[in-house]
Amino acid sequence: MNIDENDLKLKHPFTLICAGPTGSGKTILIAKILENYRLMFEPIPDKIIYCYSIWQESFLKMLNNNPNIEFIEGMVTTGQIDSSKKNLIILDDLMEENKDNEDLQNIFTKGSHHRNISLNFISQNLFIQGKKTRTISLNTHYMIIFKNPRDKAQFSQLARQMLPGKTQFLNECYVDATNSAHGYLFLDFKQQTPENLRVRTNIIPGDKYIVYIKK
């Protein structure tokens, strides 16, 4: 199958959810994405803001690999975002405590296009319960889903809601993609993405990427 490498890039502006339990490999993967951001995003972001709840030593390595990252403790506000620049914002494990945050809802519903923002949510759960965040899971452009042995029902629920008619296919892809340590399934819901590239894994440049196609 011939694939245009440009079709594999994350198209700004976007929203992305990276979900999985503690220790599943979320932070490791996000660090690799940020290390390769010039190859993985189209167009390339001008500014990267990483919002965190607890400082981790791994952030220093991210900063060494990419000095353009600005780390902020807690939730970024709309006033801290320069809409004249292409912004990539990572919210690391901040969803639960900010589930009713007005800024979060405004950034999500209006931010992508109007404020020139791409949002990357790192969360332990696919579905965040809250008045301001209920729509995020069901309206995101990209999803990275790690293995969660304690709650397999989350993925089945997602498959039924987002890709009805393909539930069994997606469950099989999920099992295969998460079979290895730190394995994950990548789902692409961007409108312009070719249909045969919507379900993938190994998205980091240099990895042997895999595309799942329903027979």
Model-derived segments and their meaning:
Residues F14-L39, P43, S53-S58, N64-Q168:
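Conserved P-loop NTPase motor cores
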